[in-house]
């Protein structure tokens, strides 16, 4: 049975038109009012984070330069105990400051991503193109600074430990040998040998940016305490021939210890130029390019 199509009432048409007008008005209000306000708010937040990142990068750049100027003179292990304590505190504080500044960079990038992801935009907000290069430069500067401060922390912590071992040799082992207190000397040598063997891996850690010449110094120090232990044990057992051989080995090891220490100190400048200066240059160059 044929049924004619139902006619849509004028009321329905009017309601539909009103809905469309309201929807269009809402979209227009979003485009004209809400969207610009949201973009402006994100731009302001991003700008604040960028300013904090620039300030942090500037402070970090200055601190890193000061830190490595002192370390570079003789290498971390060549510093005095007081210098090591002071520089280690500076390295840890600067590494934290660099991490904080990098956090501001990442926060600024998050605000950029939020602004770029807002709907109904024909193009990205202007502040993104203006600030993105600066954030990229800051990221590079701070990443290099973190490598340097982390290396300084590792190197100075190791230096602190090795200097204590060197002091034990001169302050405990050598007096025991001189007094022919063979049991005390053998015990001290054994403890030092165990400790120095544990330091051979850290001293070769590439993240510490430590000159490989210092690893040779650690090996020479280990040779000294090993020879001292053999000398003490042979002397205690009254094994004259073995004691003489160990004494000769000990003298040779001491000479090698002095030679490797001098070589590491003399080579400090060349090593820093090769391993450290490029990173320092990156920090300074990238921070300057970012306006820090």
Set out the residue ranges of the language-model regions.
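Leu/Val/Ala/Ile-rich N-terminal alpha-helices, chiefly Sec-type signal peptides and the beginnings
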Residues: 2-150, 255-291
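Extended amphipathic alpha-helical interaction segments
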Residues: 124-255
